[in-house]
């Protein structure tokens, strides 16, 4: 079975760029109710995932942080504890399932590492 059958395309998925500010990332994650979000560079390549935990540990370095200051802190300066590993669009189901067992979502990239969407666990664990 083709894994693209389960794909939420990039156009339907929230993501952030690695040059976004902390405030932009926080507001995007809050708006979409995401605990983790794909991060891309401006060329559209998947560079990793930023999580609520990454943000919390990163903000610990700043004293008296407020939303105004968060507009000047860039997300690429935050250490990421564990990036979600992407799968290629032509991967097989076995590879997808092994990744999905340890990740909230599985990023999918094309053969040039361009982000094309995500596959979520709910899509293929649902009985319907």
PLM feature spans:
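Structured interaction and signal-relay segments at domain junctions
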Residues: 51-64
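Short hydrophobic beta-strand motif reused across regulatory alpha/beta modules
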Residues: 49-51, 106, 118-122
């Amino acid at each position: 079975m083709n894994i693209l059958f389960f794909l939420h395309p990039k156009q339907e998925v929230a993501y952030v760029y690695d040059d976004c500010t902390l405030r932009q990332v926080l507001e995007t994650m809050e708006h979409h109710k995401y605990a983790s979000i794909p991060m891309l560079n401006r060329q559209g390549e998947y560079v990793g995932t930023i999580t609520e935990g990454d943000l919390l540990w990163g903000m610990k370095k700043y004293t008296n942080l407020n939303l105004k200051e968060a507009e000047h802190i860039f997300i690429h300066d935050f250490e990421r504890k564990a990036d979600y590993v992407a799968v290629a669009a032509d991967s097989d189901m076995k590879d997808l399932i092994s990744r999905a067992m340890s990740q909230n979502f599985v990023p999918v990239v094309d053969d040039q590492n361009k982000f094309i969407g995500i596959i979520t666990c709910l899509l293929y664990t649902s009985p319907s």
